[in-house]
Amino acid sequence: MKYIKDNLEKINASISDDVVLVAVSKTKPIADLQEAYDAGQRVFGENKIQEMVAKYDALPKDIQWHMIGHLQSNKVKYMAHFVDLIHGVDSFKTLKEINKQAKKHDRIISCLLQVRIAKEETKFGLPYEEISTILHAEELKNLTNINIAGFMGMATFTSEETVLDEEFSLLKAFFDQNQPQHPNLKILSMGMSGDYKIGIRNGSTMIRVGSSIFGARNYIT
């Protein structure tokens, strides 16, 4: 499976050191993740908590685990003891649950608020004005076991670069607008296998790449 190592080297050579590469390992067998780990990859993203827990138990403990899928509040408790970053937070209710579970483990869990930047109706996330409401909410000050570390956006599924540039650049402008008042905002997660170069061009500091590392998806049962 040398192709995994080769793919990682190729991607890392194309991005700067200040961009974090999240290897999206959902549906991939543990052997593939171990191969990526042996090639130096330490940040992995999963979209199902049960699968992430199983991989956490089986793999080295210096891995950083990111939850990148849409999060159900009632599942937070299963990963609160180890998850490093939760990407897809799009409700205050979920923030409160993450805070509650983090407190039980005496941890502060970092989260990214998911902004709805795509034109497609199927995408999760909140419109810009609702993100602003959360950031300025008085109640947020009481959630001392979470850290809102930045924003995540999924662009429209299209090959039209002008559309992607517009969506990503708007999110970057929103990030820049809010960062002075909220200095904990440090991460801008924009870009996946098909559009990460455009994301980086527009200021992304974190990319989520799966198929370009591991190949086509393998559904594991």
Feature map (PLM): residue ranges:
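Conserved, well-ordered active-site substructure
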Residues: 206
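Conserved alpha/beta-domain cores
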Residues: 1-173, 177-194, 200-202
